[in-house]
Amino acid sequence: MAKLLSRNDARKAKHLRIRNKIRKTTNLPRVFVYKSLQNFYAQLFDDKLNKTIVSLGTSKNKEYSGNIAAAKKLGHEMGALLKTKKIDKIVFDRSGYIYHGRVKAFAEAMREEGVKF
């Protein structure tokens, strides 16, 4: 009998498929997100150099930071950091998460800062 995948295992498998496609097709840096129940994290990664350029998270906030408002604030911070590093085009990797809620708020906040993807 086939073993059923949990929701998180299915998301991880989807993330690997997406990441492999992105690596093959583009030379742009990749922003990917991770969300836990209480926090939200984002990293800018250069696949050519195999190096993390920028890493941000909401875990250092004293107030609850697992909501849409915190993700939006993090998106504005990430957009501002990308401007200072003169990066205006990226590839957004949502890590297998649905484009809704915190992921959507983060992406739209980065677009408001002028980042194109």
UniProtKB/Swiss-Prot annotation:
Annotated Gene Ontology cellular component terms: cytoplasm; ribonucleoprotein complex; ribosome
CDD domains, sorted: Ribosomal_L18_L5e
Pfam families assigned to the protein according to its UniProt record, in alphabetical order: Ribosomal_L18p
Molecular function GO terms recorded: 5S rRNA binding; structural constituent of ribosome
Gene3D superfamilies attached to this UniProt entry: 3.30.420.100
GO BP terms: translation
Entry keyword annotation includes Nucleotidyltransferase: no
Classification via NCBIfam families: L18_bact
Role summary: This is one of the proteins that bind and probably mediate the attachment of the 5S RNA into the large ribosomal subunit, where it forms part of the central protuberance.
Family classification: Belongs to the universal ribosomal protein uL18 family.
Name of the protein in question: Large ribosomal subunit protein uL18
Organism: Mycoplasma mobile (strain ATCC 43663 / 163K / NCTC 11711)
